[in-house]
Amino acid sequence: ERLRAGLARGLSFPAARQAAGGADCLASPNDNLGVEYLRALPPGMEALTIPRRGAAHDGPAAGGFASASELRALLRAGRAAEADPYLPAPWSGEAASMAHIDRAVLARLRTMDEADWAALPDGGAAEGLPARLARSARTADSLEDFYARAKTKRYPHARLRRLALAAFLGLRAAERPPVAPYVRVLGLSGRGRALLRRMKETCALPVVVKPAQARALDGDARALFEAEARRTDLFGLCFPTARPCG
């Protein structure tokens, strides 16, 4: 009841939940995410919480640690030398940024009607959000302007960014699989290689390390991998020098 009252006052769900529960830990975005992970855990799994050391979420470097947000900001600003102490190896590449696809994303948003917005994951149809998003997209002259026009206490910046990106990538709630049809390995350490060998024998799902291994997938798994590959090609446009597909 207190949660519903907070939402009725225009608070975002995390803020309304914190006010209803009176829990200081729910003031942190990462702690809110942790609560959702705990809710999703199947019976029999036990969670282990580990205190965060050093930099806070989106905060400056502290205690020998830097947040991912801080590191991305340094790299995008061309200040790689300041980021290097917090990285496993010196940075020598380009940093991706949605600023490079601002017009492309906005072009997609301007073509969308309320039904298109409602079809997105977390599109907020029950809250009346699609009408606000469609109206904001038609009048905004940049992505930041779109976020500023659409933002309210209930619809925070982070949610709007996710919706804009989902729209650009063509994601739809109805097409989201209920469970992951395969495991995609993006990187691993020496210990990870040992675990990978064991996974190939014990994992209930196909394990994909190299794109060529996706040829063995079929049905929904193959369709999802192909969709993932197409969206990765779009990510290549986020670099200062656009990268080719593949």
Short names for language-model regions:
Residues 1-246:
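Active-site cores that bind ATP or allylic diphosphates and position pyrophosphate for catalysis
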